[in-house]
Amino acid sequence: MSGFIKSTLLGLGQDYLEDQYQEFAEQHFQPTRDPFYETNKDGKKHRRRLPYYCTKDESKAWKKVQNKAWLHDKSLCGCCCWTNTIGWAPLLALLPVIGPLLMYWVHDKLIELADDRYKLPAEIKVKMHGNIVIDLLISLVPILGSVFAWLHACSTRNAAIVYNFVGKRALERKQAELMHQKEENEKHSNANTAPPVVGGNKNVNGNRNNSKMYNRPPVTAPPAPAYTRSTNGRPQRGYR
């Protein structure tokens, strides 16, 4: 019966922790398609940053990825001039023959940077290279291909993939830390409320028995018989 109650409580605790995880994830992280801007509660837009639970190195690397994606798709002036115009990649696609290859090389630099800083898994890199291939096929169309490549915004899509991956991984890491802290607190609380050791009770009982034995009166043996001489000279058996 105690095993059934224990398993039931563990199941309820696991469901509760999963609900808490989902609630924490919904409040602190949401996937995005726009890696450049986010909107505050008051409706104002500002530059998108990684969530607060990410490390400083992750945040610094994200700024570099963000600036490179902006340079490729949105602005010729680079990160110092955040004006939504046109980036280098669509212009390179206008060059005959070599243009699409140069555009592919530009977009691939973003993947190399992200992989070097975040150690991306294989499935994420395959997805990002797939976006570059689509952009390359679109840019093969003369003139209009450059327009389609600009609208497709390959580096923007790949930067959003990087943001979502890094944010989700950091969220799982933060949640694991919270779970570990909770388990440690439960261990300490259980140790403080643990029942006395059974062996100690045995020793106490043993001491009580010993005290009873010490309180008993000592057992005295009867005196040994001895032979004494009577007054008439005959030996007489008796006790001294």
Curated annotation (Swiss-Prot):
Extracellular face of the membrane: 107-131
Keywords: Membrane, Transmembrane, Transmembrane helix
Topology in the lipid bilayer: Multi-pass membrane protein
Top-level division of the source organism's lineage: Eukaryota
Transmembrane segments: 86-106, 132-152
Further information: Present with 1520 molecules/cell in log phase SD medium.
Protein name: Uncharacterized membrane protein YLR326W
Lineage of the organism: Eukaryota, Fungi, Dikarya, Ascomycota, Saccharomycotina
